[in-house]
Design a protein with these regions (language model features):
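Hydrophobic or amphipathic, alpha-helical segments that drive membrane association/targeting
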Residues: 1-121, 178-222, 252-256, 304
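An active-site-proximal "capping" alpha-helix that borders the catalytic cofactor pocket
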Residues: 68, 96-101, 224-241
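Residue-level signature of catalytic and energy-coupling elements of molecular machines
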Residues: 68, 97, 122, 136, ...
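Active-site-proximal gating segments in proteases and membrane effectors
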Residues: 106-131, 195-197, 205-206, 235-304
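Membrane-proximal, non-transmembrane interface segments of integral membrane proteins
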Residues: 119, 135, 151-152, 162
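Alpha-helical transmembrane cores and adjacent cytosolic helix/loop segments
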Residues: 142-143
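Active-site His/Glu-centered metal-binding helix of metallohydrolases
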Residues: 153, 157-161, 230, 234
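Catalytic Zn2+-binding segment of zinc metalloproteases
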Residues: 157-176
Length: 304
């Protein structure tokens, strides 16, 4: 039977954390914001550029920096590292994250926790790969075997080593900056056309603001789906494709109601995302994860 013992003997070519990717995202976001100001708002607004950067990118980055403390309170997470594991499966989580951290050459072990929920969930958060936290739900421990749990944890550790949380925050900041620029343009036009156009300008303001939020969600969701495929692929590489496939198949069985949950609760969310797997057509634009069918198919291609 596959499991942690087999993984210990596996030689892993640890991927280099692509700091160039993070730096590129940051540079592109800052430069694109400057360019948008110059094109759409003119040179006059360039004097507000530093303030705009602080407001647009500061909020998501501060949120990321404080994410560990926030989610610990919100989800009542009990830390199980440093001797806090109470069951065999909790110890499995600690041992797996520890082993993967060593194989991925992380300088600091992520904090590890369990939270009381019937959802089949796990997530990673933190500002960087060396200040991360990985948490799993009690529902996941109750309803997955050793191989499946390892697959899920490898997926979350892939998010950590890829710096996905930071790049998502940068994208959020860019969308926010674009919204602030457009808002300035509309409000400025409203001030310059006070006679008879105030109501129309305000209506335009809300229409464009909502449109920006709408398309921003589509962009963020598309990036998230791409990110999930990447995490699945890396998880399969550092463990074995069968680990990731078994976890995804188990999630598929649970989502389709083909197995009885030990918790007696069919509320389902894969890897800390609500159930979007029944979505189709237009609704797929807002799905943060690819369908389980597509993810399983991608892993099966790796097995060939």
């Amino acid at each position: 039977m596959k499991g942690l013992a087999e993984l210990k003997n596996k030689v892993v070519n640890a991927p280099h954390v692509n700091m160039f990717k993070v730096a590129t995202w940051t540079t592109m976001g800052v430069f694109a914001t400057y360019l948008l100001i110059y094109i759409f708002a003119g040179e006059e607004m360039l004097k507000y550029y530093p303030l705009l950067i602080v407001f647009a990118f500061g909020a998501p980055l501060v949120s990321l920096m404080t994410s560990k403390a926030s989610v610990k309170r919100a989800y009542n997470i009990r830390m199980i590292d440093n001797g806090g594991a109470r069951t065999e499966k909790e110890q499995l989580v600690v041992d797996t994250v520890t082993l993967l951290s060593e194989k991925l050459n992380l300088q600091k072990l992520p904090e590890i926790g369990v939270y009381p929920s019937n959802d089949i969930n796990a997530f990673a958060t933190g500002a960087s790969k060396n200040s991360a936290m990985v948490a799993v739900s009690q529902g996941l421990l109750n309803n997955m075997n050793e191989t499946e749990i390892i697959g899920v944890l490898a997926h979350e550790m892939s998010h950590v080593v890829n710096g996905d949380m930071l790049t998502s925050s940068i994208l959020e900041g860019f969308v926010s900056a674009f919204g602030l620029i457009i808002s300035y343009i509309i409000l400025n036009n409203r001030r310059n056309n006070r006679s008879g156009g105030a109501a129309a300008s305000m209506a335009s303001f809300y229409m464009i603001k909502n449109s920006i939020n709408f398309f921003g969600r589509i962009i963020a969701s598309a990036y998230s789906r791409r990110r999930e495929f990447g995490a699945d692929r890396l998880a399969a590489q550092i463990t074995d494709p069968s680990y990731m496939k078994s976890a995804l198949l188990r999630l598929q069985e649970i989502s389709e109601g083909r197995v009885d949950l030990q918790d007696g609760d069919r509320e389902f969310a894969a890897f800390k995302i609500t159930n979007n797997f029944s979505m189709g057509g237009f609704a797929n634009l807002f799905s943060t994860h690819p369908s389980l069918e597509k993810r399983i198919a991608a892993i099966e291609r790796m097995e060939k």
